[in-house]
Amino acid sequence: MGGYVHDVEIEGGHTIVVDEPAFVEGGTDAGPSPTRLVAAGLAGCTAVTMEMYAARRGWDVGAVEVDVDVEYEDFAPLSFAVTLRLPAGLSEEQRQRLLAVAAKCPVHRLLAGETEVVISDRIEDLPDA
């Protein structure tokens, strides 16, 4: 693969193509950028966390939607703004509980600095092609 295109293997046998947008020198837009993948992970994790919470309480919430907008400065992400879309028929108490639960999803906690990220000091050689 050329430029910044990478096949990223994920647990479970999934592969995602990662790249930078075409407006970034060397980027070809062959896949989402790593930052966009983080935003997608935050959206998915938030939705699933809220749905699991609602299911455990027997609430029929149907589908929820989560949008994540990334604010950048010089290509570096400054913030992730999360918008929740919930069914109109929920009570105010249910809505407030789901809002509180949304901030407890594992990806949100990781981004908020509640999870340790360790870069190993071990470097391995790539196998010969």
What does each of the following model-derived ranges do?
Residues 45-46:
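Alpha-helical metal-binding/catalytic segments enriched in His/Glu/Asp
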